[in-house]
Amino acid sequence: MKRKRLRFRRIRKGFYLTLLFEKYGKWFIWELKRFFVPLALFIVIVSALVFISTKDFPWREWKLSQGFYRDVFCEKIRSGSIRQPFNAWSSLIFIPIGLWMARRAFLDKVPSPRLSPIRRHKRYGLLFGISLVITGVGSWFFHASLTYVGHFVDVIGMYFLGGFLFTYGLSRKLRQSATAFLAVYAAVVVPLVLFQWFNPEASRYAFGALILSALGIEIGLHKSLSNKLFVVALLTLGLGFFIWILDEKKLLCWPQSCLQGHAIWHILTAIATQLSYLYYLSEGPRVNWKIGYRAGKYTWMNRYWKR
């Protein structure tokens, strides 16, 4: 009798494990595919940058940026290939987030007019992700070299990112198509890039104007202050900007420490952009999962929309 009970318990346990695998196992495999490619690409990019950092580049032969002479950042300028290591390596946090966005743009494309544009068209997610990758690589290059070219590449990434936030909000407000969005995006970013080459000192003001304009559009679009993701992203960005000011004014400054205010600014800004992306995804009806049942066998999970 005890053996029969034990055998029944084992069968019941195996049945429940089968149900759990059918319910969560395939979902886990799908999520693993989503993160595997970005993780592999991130490892390749970091390995390439580590290899570059082992080489001795003569940065002094390049035209140096104004930040080198004015000592804008708190971190001590070191000799070698990486002049500001903590500010440089903290910039790489933008890269995995951008790669994840670009990968998700391919996997999560759902053709439904009820969803937000960033879910209906993969070009939005791709452009958002690529701008973050360029921001990370450009910021690393700038803090590693402190050269004029490095500053230019760094600001290009900032304009790509700020231009996307501004143009995406404007396209949703005006109900533009994806093609019109790309045209407006190019009309916003290209003049800023050309202006940056001739007037590099105005970059922070132009980038600040883009961010403030994007925030104003989001608040006026559908009262985004009621959305928790938007509020947390806004608070995170504000905290990062406050720490950046303290670092620049040397009020929060330890030159030889691993704790750098500008590095914290990089991390908080990357978190704010990730929250902004999740906020964009939260627009429209939620996409949920359910298990299909057919002929005594659990089938692949299907999507359905629920407000």
Give short role names for the model-derived ranges.
Residues 205-224:
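Active-site rim beta-loop-alpha module in soluble metabolic enzymes
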